[in-house]
From Swiss-Prot:
This is Protein CbrA. It comes from Shigella flexneri serotype 5b (strain 8401). Belongs to the CbrA family. Gene3D superfamilies: FAD/NAD(P)-binding domain. One of its GO terms (molecular function) is FAD binding. Signal peptide: none annotated.
């Protein structure tokens, strides 16, 4: 039975970043359900926007995005829509439009060969015994059993590692649904949509490489019905759909309290969305995935006597920042406060009257 210093479950942005940073410094094995290349197999449903904080992480690491990861067009503003109030506002944002699946595969490709990576693999069982973590996984058509000193859960919203460590822990979850359509809008745009009759979270749209992606986060019970209802409402705001080319869905976490951030125990650690590190106000998680990976790298290389306590302390600033996003989310999803903010015109950038399309309902107050 082979033994490793670190076993990483999941190679999204968090797991890939950590594996790359530990390569050559510790003996690492990493398991991922995505294929090594191509579009077959699992791909993460995601709007695919790289936030400024994530961009800073790449600056820190000296990395630049390859052209095949970057999507077209690049959009510098978000159209925020309050459906009930029939209000639309335009706010500046500095996101990079990316192809999320290509981005994830590129992140994996940066992991050096010294890390033992298993693509298209499935983690079947984990347990702790004799001060070691045991992992049974299936890859290349057969089951393997390894042990590790440290176990890292970078396996997202449905984290197997988090469920094992905290079987009674409850965190609010939504079903994220999005559909792809052939782009029909004369001017590409990115939007953020609030409609409390549909969801107490939010919905979104993004133009990407000739497609129009429309999606949102909805209650688990009747998410599909709510998604369909919102699509019908958006015709009043000049959203154009047509026949769906592709439909996607996944579970997304929505932290709503300080206790929703869990970092691990017993030499097992959680990073990225598995730890609850996702913005409640935007559902953006890549930047926090990269930041938590960097924090855990530093903890591992220092090898403190109590690694879990050290990681908990080191993530304090990150958790405070994310708690601030919870407060912001409560403001944005409060109808009266949101309506007041949008009507005030704060930070709104008006568009010229002869702009080709305005994406507002006839009753909007601009």
């Amino acid at each position: 039975m082979e033994h490793f210093d670190v076993a990483i479950i999941g190679l999204g942005p968090a797991g890939s970043a950590l594996a790359r940073k530990l390569a050559g410094k510790m003996q690492v094995i990493a398991l991922d359900k995505k294929h090594q290349c191509g579009t077959e197999g699992f791909s993460k449903p995601c709007g695919g926007l790289l936030a400024p904080d994530a961009q800073r992480s790449f600056i820190r690491d000296g990395l630049t995005l390859p052209v095949d990861v970057i999507a077209n067009p690049q959009i510098f503003s978000v159209k925020t829509v309050d459906v009930a109030a029939s209000l639309t506002r335009n706010y500046q944002r500095s996101y990079i439009n990316i192809n999320r699946h290509a981005f994830d595969l590129w992140m994996k490709s940066l992991i050096p060969a010294s890390v033992e990576v298993y693509h298209d693999s499935l983690c079947r069982k984990i347990w702790r015994e004799d001060d070691k973590w045991h992992v049974i996984f299936r890859a290349d058509g057969w089951e393997q059993h390894i042990t590790a000193r440290y176990l890292v859960g970078a396996d997202g919203a449905n984290s197997m590692v988090r469920r094992h460590l905290y079987p009674d822990h409850q965190i609010r979850k939504y079903v994220a649904i999005q559909q792809w359509f052939a782009e029909k809008h004369p001017v590409p745009f990115y939007s953020c949509i609030f409609d409390n009759a549909i969801t107490d979270c939010y919905s979104w749209s993004i133009s990407k490489d000739g497609y129009f992606i429309f999606g949102g986060a909805y209650p688990m019970k009747d998410g599909q019905t709510r998604f369909t209802t919102l699509k019908e409402k958006m015709s009043a705001f000049q959203f154009q759909f047509g026949k769906a080319v592709k439909s996607e869905k996944c579970t997304v976490l929505f932290p709503s309290r300080w206790q929703d951030f869990v970092c691990g125990k017993d030499n097992a650690f959680l990073i990225g969305e598995a730890a609850g590190f996702i913005s409640a106000s935007s559902l953006e998680g890549i930047s926090y995935a990269l930041d938590s990976a960097e924090i855990l790298r530093a903890v591992f290389l220092k090898q403190p006597e109590k690694s879990n306590a050290a990681y908990w302390r080191a993530t304090h600033k990150l958790r405070l920042k994310l708690f601030g996003k919870i407060v912001k989310s409560r403001c944005l999803t409060a109808p009266a406060l949101r309506k007041w903010i949008m009507r005030s015109g704060m930070a709104h950038i008006p568009q010229l009257k002869d702009y080709p399309t305005r994406f507002t309902s006839p009753t909007s107050r601009m």
